[in-house]
A protein has these predicted regions:
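Conserved eukaryotic protein kinase-like
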Residues: 37-376
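Membrane-proximal cytoplasmic juxtamembrane segment of single-pass cell-surface glycoproteins
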Residues: 14-37
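Single-pass alpha-helical transmembrane segments
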Residues: 1-14
Length: 376
């Protein structure tokens, strides 16, 4: 689909009245650009599961801690070859398949030493178009270190194979949980904690990584959950380094997923961290309502979730907005704050959106209020 068509659809997601006040279809992803590369390497593996306890805004003690991120060729290697990968994935058996996306398919794999990892394999039929995405994900993942971001463990680039090896996150995607495909439905407290985790991960990318990173594809299917229902942001194929000069934006081709795309970015081709903030606002509405950004099977006045949510928010019908699968009562003051923050993040112009650090702080304050309300 051409870019103008995406622009029309995504602009339709924004209610014009936003400016006056600060389970349906699958995700459609914009095409990738081309690039070339030729190297083989892998990174050291380590423990991949860790329970993240609830805490205030979890930030690195100092940005300087990450100022000397090691280059790929300096990180301890596990020297995985294709025969080892084939054994670990049972020759890429469908029984090991745990996910699919724009880059390719993801498999659960057990290494010879017993470690369980995830191996993402590029689609061969789209190999040329996916080379840029592969390089971007490897290079950017190698520079980050945060509990709420999926950790890169290794990669293989040999012949016609492109593999990315990451930590294994066993809980599946957030979207699967919202669709009710898992054993238990997420309760409100879990959804609030997941929102905070994602905000922390994005804040790290924007402010505390060695260089500013803009994710560009924040969505529910790119949020992985641990067994204890803590969130990790995944899939950095569309990620882009922010500008390290005095500029306020990066001019670049539009990439991302329909329904989550910043309308100002689509109009001007100017990418900023506030583009991730917009996507997070859409995600937060998704977490609270259970609805996808666009649901064509619903009635006309409910197909675009942002429009529907804004109308309900102005009417003060917060409980009607809450995902009915939760089947629980939540203090309306808490819901008003949560939905209000989501709508503010999804403002049509970046100047009206908070930054991710502020979003995380507001969510933490909402969490404190929620815990107090539960004790009453």
């Amino acid at each position: 689909m051409a870019i103008p068509a995406f622009f029309v659809l995504c602009c339709a997601l924004i209610c014009p009245c936003f400016q006056a006040r600060k389970k349906g279809i699958g995700h459609s992803v914009l095409p990738k650009e081309l690039n070339s590369m030729d190297s083989v390497s892998s990174l050291e593996t380590n423990s991949v599961s860790e329970k993240i306890m609830a805490s205030p805004l979890r930030m690195p003690p100092s940005p300087s801690r990450f100022s000397m991120s090691p280059k790929l060729d300096r990180i301890g290697s596990v020297h995985l070859n294709m025969s080892q990968v084939a054994r670990a994935t049972r020759n890429f058996s469908s029984s090991q398949l745990i996910g699919e996306g724009g880059f390719g398919t993801v498999y659960r794999a057990e290494l010879p030493d017993g470690k369980v990892v995830a191996i993402k394999r590029a689609r061969k039929e789209y190999f040329e178009a996916l080379q840029t995405e592969f390089r971007s994900e490897v290079e950017l993942l190698s520079k980050i270190d945060h509990k709420n971001l999926v950790k890169l463990l290794g990669y293989v680039e040999k012949g016609n194979e492109r593999l990315i090896i990451t930590e294994y996150v066993p809980g599946g995607t957030l979207r699967e949980h919202l669709d009710g495909l898992k054993e238990k439905i997420l309760d409100f407290n879990q959804r609030l904690e997941i929102s905070i985790d994602v905000a922390h991960g994005l804040t790290y990318l924007h402010l505390y990584a060695e260089k500013q990173i803009i994710h560009r594809d924040v969505k529910s299917s790119n949020i992985l959950l641990t067994e204890s229902m803590r969130a990790k942001v995944a899939d950095f194929g569309f990620a882009r380094l922010g500008d390290d000069s005095d500029k306020t934006h990066v001019s670049t081709k539009v990439k991302g997923t329909v329904g989550y795309l910043d309308p100002e970015y689509m109009k001007t081709y100017q990418l900023t961290p506030k583009s991730d903030v917009f996507s997070f606002g859409v995600l937060l509405l998704e977490i609270l309502t259970g609805r996808r950004p666009v649901e064509l099977k619903r009635s006309r006045d409910e197909r675009v979730t942002i429009r529907w949510a804004f109308r309900k928010y102005n009417e003060g019908k917060y409980m009607e907005m809450l995902d009915p699968l939760m089947n629980e009562m939540v203090d309306e003051d808490i819901l008003e704050k949560m939905f209000g923050l989501a709508i503010q993040c999804a403002a049509p112009t970046r100047a009206d959106r908070p930054d991710m650090k502020s979003v995380g702080e507001q969510l933490w304050g909402i969490r404190m209020d929620y815990l107090k309300s539960e004790r009453r």
